[in-house]
Amino acid sequence: RASVLHTSKKLTRAETIFSNMNYENSSEAEIIWDNVTQSNQSFDDFNRVVGGEDAARGQFPWQVLLHGEIAAFCGGSIVNEKWVVTAAHCIKPGVKITVVAGEHNTEKPEPTEQKRNVIRAIPYHGYNASINKYSHDIALLELDEPLELNSYVTPICIADREYTNIFLKFGYGYVSGWGRVFNRGRSASILQYLKVPLVDRATCLRSTKFTIYNHMFCAGYHEGGKDSCQGDSGGPHVTEVEGTSFLTGIISWGEECAMKGKYGIYTKVSRYEV
């Protein structure tokens, strides 16, 4: 995810999802977005999971890693065989993106890995990085070839808007990624995950001088020490309901990582139709 420095710079966690996306046909990917609220806030890019645990192989089979030509930089979630959802701020003009599904340990090749090239990136139509890098921070990525689904490569469940909002209010969610394991530290080689509590909106608003729009939510621990961080952007915030995991948020941004009194900021999936 992206972090915001106290010099007024916001860092992304590499980062968020789509507002009012009407995803009725994966081949057409017709998207309907809300209007962007303008902001003069300035941002810089970053993101990851601090204070988390090593995930078991196949524990989060919807998780993917986004690779540029040099290194990995963001996460994402499998929507179906041909589409991945991530944060819009992860998309850079002219940068070739490779999606790696079935990844667990980034330091060695694994038989569960599947690599696909991104042939089309579709940010939410109201997303405008020059106005606000994290408002409506959500995008879809179309893959060149379908993924082969199995126990290590599986789409995340996405409920309708009403139920997604209800699930989010259950209170706790899981975030995952290969981002930094401590603020400004090294990135994880093994997929990390962390259980984070939802933070009430009033507390969320008081915790930062930056604008928290209605399509964002806060999650994390007041005491600090546990958080998503740089490199985690675009990855999932999921809520488990009777043994089934549903996508409820997209890792977007935050102020540094795991700081006391600060929280991770996520795109609220219930604001968008997939």
From Swiss-Prot:
The keyword Iron does not apply. Glycans are attached at N25, N35, T37, N40, N128. Disulfide bonds join C74-C90, C204-C218, C229-C257. Keywords: Blood coagulation, Calcium, Disulfide bond, Glycoprotein, Hemostasis, Hydrolase, Metal-binding, Phosphoprotein, Protease, Secreted, Serine protease, Sulfation. It is found in: Secreted. The keyword Transmembrane does not apply. The modification Phosphoserine is found at S26. Pfam families: Trypsin (PF00089). One of its GO terms (biological process) is blood coagulation. The modification Sulfotyrosine is found at Y23. It catalyses: Selective cleavage of Arg-|-Ile bond in factor X to form factor Xa. Activated by factor XIa, which excises the activation peptide. The propeptide can also be removed by snake venom protease. Activated by coagulation factor VIIa-tissue factor (F7-F3) complex in calcium-dependent manner. It comes from the Eukaryota. Factor IX is a vitamin K-dependent plasma protein that participates in the intrinsic pathway of blood coagulation by converting factor X to its active form in the presence of Ca(2+) ions, phospholipids, and factor VIIIa. Belongs to the peptidase S1 family. PANTHER family: SRCR DOMAIN-CONTAINING PROTEIN (PTHR24264:SF65), TRYPSIN-RELATED (PTHR24264). This is Coagulation factor IX. It comes from Ovis aries. The gene is F9.
